[in-house]
From Swiss-Prot:
Keywords on record: Electron transport, Membrane, Mitochondrion, Mitochondrion inner membrane, NAD, Respiratory chain, Translocase, Transmembrane, Transmembrane helix, Transport, Ubiquinone
UniProt name for this protein: NADH-ubiquinone oxidoreductase chain 2
Localisation per UniProt entry: Mitochondrion inner membrane
Native organism: Debaryomyces hansenii (strain ATCC 36239 / CBS 767 / BCRC 21394 / JCM 1990 / NBRC 0083 / IGC 2968)
Source lineage: Eukaryota, Fungi, Dikarya, Ascomycota, Saccharomycotina
GO cellular component: mitochondrial inner membrane
Function: Core subunit of the mitochondrial membrane respiratory chain NADH dehydrogenase (Complex I) that is believed to belong to the minimal assembly required for catalysis. Complex I functions in the transfer of electrons from NADH to the respiratory chain. The immediate electron acceptor for the enzyme is believed to be ubiquinone.
Ranges annotated as spanning the membrane: 25-45, 58-78, 90-110, 113-133, 145-165, 186-206, 219-239, 248-268, 272-292, 295-315, 344-364, 385-405, 414-436
Length: 450
């Protein structure tokens, strides 16, 4: 259905305004999400099924992640369905996003190394074009070129790993490789593939390029590429965690944890701080992957909710900036967070409290589940390290909260548009009432792991 929508809008975007294309496309993706939700039967799917000559594997483990990505895309697209003070309309935005969405939804299902590379490139090339969509911006073009160069290096490493695996096993299908696990060192080369994927995700120590890309790209493009692209890759890694050795994951875990806790202490750029915040969150996700626990799903949900509110809040706060740094990223520095809208400031403060891990926000429950699962699997040192680094990271979260607390209600002529306000209100309500759904959510995750 996504491919059909792409073909239709490829023609429709030529004869229509970008706003109409964005609105129609958002409705199409919402309808796709609804169909996906109504047809999803996780219990009946166990143990799973293969598609397209065993190239893709549909299991109860990757279905919830695909639905989560679809929901995130819908909520991010709501921003482009109405006019804003600093508008960046483009008729190609939705086409590139639909192309990227095909790669995103197929990536967690991949069961073959050839399909893995093809789907990765489908996802990556659309992201390169999305990043450089506004070519009048020098920073946007620079971000797109840097993203393309670093993504090309990671893709080369992926091909190298696939070559070594095929040379040893004689197959590229992951299901067929299961028989080689006990007496072959083919799975050592999957660690090279893991390094390539973590490189593409921007995990430390291979992270400097991603910080630059997120900083140079327009804010609403940064919101998309910093969340959705990482989610698809980490979903595939979690679904195929048995292919990788933990020593590589632990190495990236410790370095990412240290960098994400220390580096933002000296930052005043909000997008850079949120990029390091995402790295800290993915350190928790790496820990849950090592223990292979359903806490992974809970943490992914809270990560999506909190970062969605923060990025949409930045876009909403941009409406009140009278002296923008640029029209592509009006809100850039922390001192600009003094907002005349206390309700918006409250939503941002609530999301930051969730990142800190204050109860009863989702961040508290997600971190509790991840750390409990890690301790049960005897990851004691890793648990102590992540607690210490999270306490250090609290400083820069608290610094942002302090600036937001200085906000005051003022009479202004610029207002947030209704679609963005509705999305922010819905996400904030879900964030605030997350603890009410925890029993049902835990029960559902238990059924997945049976």
């Amino acid at each position: 259905m996504t491919f059909t929508a792409f073909t239709m809008f490829l023609v429709f975007s030529t004869f229509s305004q970008s706003m109409m294309v964005n609105r129609t496309g958002t409705i199409t993706i919402m309808f796709t999400t609804m169909l996906f939700f109504l047809s999803m039967d996780i219990v009946a799917m166990s143990p799973g099924m293969t598609l397209f000559n065993n190239w893709f594997n549909l299991t109860p483990y990757n279905l919830p992640l695909s639905f989560l990505m679809l929901s995130l895309i819908v909520m991010l697209l709501m921003y482009s369905t109405s006019n804003h003070r600093y508008d960046l309309k483009s008729p190609f935005y939705l086409l590139l996003l639909l192309t990227n969405m095909m790669g995103l939804l197929l990536f967690p299902l991949v069961n073959d190394l050839i399909a893995l590379y093809v789907v990765m490139e489908l996802q990556s090339y659309s992201l390169y074009l999305l990043t450089g969509l506004h070519s009048r911006s020098y920073n946007s073009s620079r971000a797109s070129l840097l993203y393309f160069l670093m993504g090309g290096v990671a893709s080369t490493i992926m091909l190298l790993a696939s070559y070594f695996v095929y040379a040893l096993t004689g197959t590229t299908n992951l299901s067929d490789m299961a028989m080689f696990y006990s007496y072959s060192n083919a799975f050592d080369y999957f660690d090279i593939l893991l390094v390539a994927l973590l490189f593409k995700m921007g995990m430390a120590p291979l992270h400097r390029w991603s910080i630059a890309v997120y900083n140079y790209a327009p804010t609403y493009i940064t919101a998309y590429i910093s969340m959705v692209a990482k989610m698809s890759m980490v979903s595939w890694i979690f679904a195929n965690a048995n292919l990788f050795h933990h020593h590589v994951t632990i190495l990236f875990f410790y370095i990412s944890l240290a960098m994400a806790a220390y580096k933002p202490l000296f930052q005043v750029n909000i997008k850079t701080m949120l990029a390091y915040s995402g790295m800290l969150n993915f350190s928790y996700i790496l820990l849950s992957m090592m223990s292979y626990d359903p806490a992974f799903y809970i943490y992914m949900i809270q990560y999506v909710l909190t970062h969605l509110i923060l990025f949409l809040g930045m876009l909403g706060a941009s409406q009140y900036v009278n002296s923008p740094i640029s029209i592509w990223s009006p809100l850039t520095f922390m001192h600009q967070l003094k907002l005349p809208n206390l309700t918006l400031a409250f939503s941002l403060i609530l999301a930051l409290f969730s990142l800190i891990g204050m109860p009863p926000t989702p961040g508290f429950y997600a971190k509790l589940f991840v750390l409990s699962a890690a301790l049960q699997d005897n990851y004691v040192l890793e648990t102590c390290a992540i607690v210490v680094c999270s306490v250090v990271a609290t400083y820069y979260y608290a610094n942002m909260i302090k600036v937001l607390f200085n906000s005051s209600t003022q009479k202004v002529t610029n207002f947030i548009n209704p679609s963005l306000a509705f999305t922010m209100a819905s996400a904030t309500s879900l964030l605030f009432s997350f603890f009410m759904f925890m029993p049902s959510l835990s029960e559902g995750l238990y059924l997945i792991t049976l």
